[in-house]
């Protein structure tokens, strides 16, 4: 699993926190950030440079003109797909954790209100 990331030398893809991608001249720059260890100010990161793929395409469907376009490297596209899988999974886990915590807070509120209601009923019984 994550063969493209492993081919870049990333041995523990599960430690990836996030990534950024930017274009610089004729290159795409991929920067991968790893989870911070306790006591670290900055996250560890690695940077990779991918040359953009050049293609010559028809400029318009009617004429005979051609133009050169640049696209993201196919290898980089595969790496980004794997990074998206990792980063999306992390977001899903965070969302699930948030939902569980919200459900617990709601349950706590319901139980607290019910206890107060029962105690009030008991108080009414003891006054008689």
Curated annotation (Swiss-Prot):
InterPro entries (alphabetical): UPF0325 (IPR020911)
NCBIfam families per the UniProt record, alphabetical: PRK13677.1 (NF010213)
Similarity section: Belongs to the UPF0325 family.
Protein name stated in the entry: UPF0325 protein KPN78578_01770
Organism for this UniProt entry: Klebsiella pneumoniae subsp. pneumoniae (strain ATCC 700721 / MGH 78578)
Taxonomic placement: Bacteria, Pseudomonadati, Pseudomonadota, Gammaproteobacteria, Enterobacterales
